[in-house]
Amino acid sequence: MEHICKESVAALRDYINSHLPGTIHAVDDQKDIEHPLNYPYTSPCSGHKFREFYYWDTYFTCLGLVHLDRWDMILNNIKNCFDLIDKFGYVPNYNRYHGCNRSQPPFLVNLVDLYYRHTGDLEFLQEGVEHLEKELVFWYNQRSFENGLAHYGYQLRPRAESLAFYEMINRTRVPYPLEDEEEKLQAAYQFYAEAESGWDFNPRFDHKALEYAALDLNCNLYAYEAMLAQFHMLLENPEKASQWQKRAEERKARMNQKMLDKESGLFLDYSVALDQRSSCFSLASYFPLYQGLATQEQAEDAVKALPRFLYPYGLSTCEKAEHSVTYQWDYPNGWPPLQIVVVRGLLRYGYVQEANTAAEAFLTNVIKNFEESGHLWEKYNVVEGSLNVSNEYELPIMLGWAAAAALEMMDVLGL
């Protein structure tokens, strides 16, 4: 890439190689964590901020660990997910009390697939299948509408605790002033569900995440069903493979019926309560490519929509629009995991030039701010190439998925 200096890439890679291992926590480094893990684990940051085990952060961190050849830590992270499923029935948002009344976007099937393709270990795959199926029971029984599509949600907590959660979010994260206590309680439940999406907080659901079939979630669950079909064939269980393939096809059909916007050609979040698709265009529309659900024609429509999101320094989380509230999962913020989803999704469908353009834009942003600050960050302004982002809390120095995105973009660009 003529626009990216090789020396800058080398310096960033050296920084990641030396600092990413600093996010690994030993088993005995959990004395104040209510739900300690049985294996070493990675956290999003080094130091004391965000030092817990976060579900979807862990998946993207593992994509970075691949480039460091740290398969031992990838396996440790997977085993921790297995143990959490055995304990809760799902992988919590994070392993403290306040993170355990919800999950996060489920990516364990992608991790199991990643590790199996590296090792060919059928015993591991069998254990993985058992835990993936157990996790799906949670998503089916506690996070699904009658039409079979899934939504984000929460596990019930004491009334006073939920009211306190509402007050905290309203005061420090997203202004949503209410007077009636029952309305505050219902708002807290919606905030919990939106936190489960990982995109806390965003304009996609209009503060009604419980009412929406979430696009990214249903794409991920489709991947579970489709990959479980493949796994069962590898394990010589053709009958079970057929059952899972049928579930995958049924979900895909429902999504095409309810979530595909004919005008734009994009899949969108779908309000079951209103029986209509969301008017918010976001990078969630690239999950059908990342998880292999889209047809080639649908992928082409997603490529045509890239100008809604692509800026000189990466992909904006949502299309620019006016909102009464400032969200951090919105324009002009570019979040590292979503850059990976879009770029890898484009490559999956053969759009190499478009993937390279997006990868170069975001890597340029990361390098620019690394050279100015000496750090990687949780999110970036993709319009300016700066750290002038919409925040709901102080912008944290980040390794985890920021390092992973940088390494993935380098890999895509052959740097």
Protein language model regions, located:
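Extended glycan-interaction surfaces of carbohydrate-active proteins
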Residues: 2-52, 76-95, 148-212, 250-334, ...
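Alpha-helical support elements that line or immediately flank enzyme active sites
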Residues: 54-84, 284-295, 339-352
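TPR repeat positional signature
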Residues: 58, 109-112, 218, 222-225, ...
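Aromatic/His-enriched, Gly/Pro-containing loop or helix-boundary segments
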Residues: 86-128, 396
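Inter-helical turn/loop segments and adjacent helix faces that build the functional surface
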Residues: 115-126, 228-243, 349-353
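Short amphipathic alpha-helical coiled-coil/interface segments
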Residues: 132-135, 241-259, 359-362
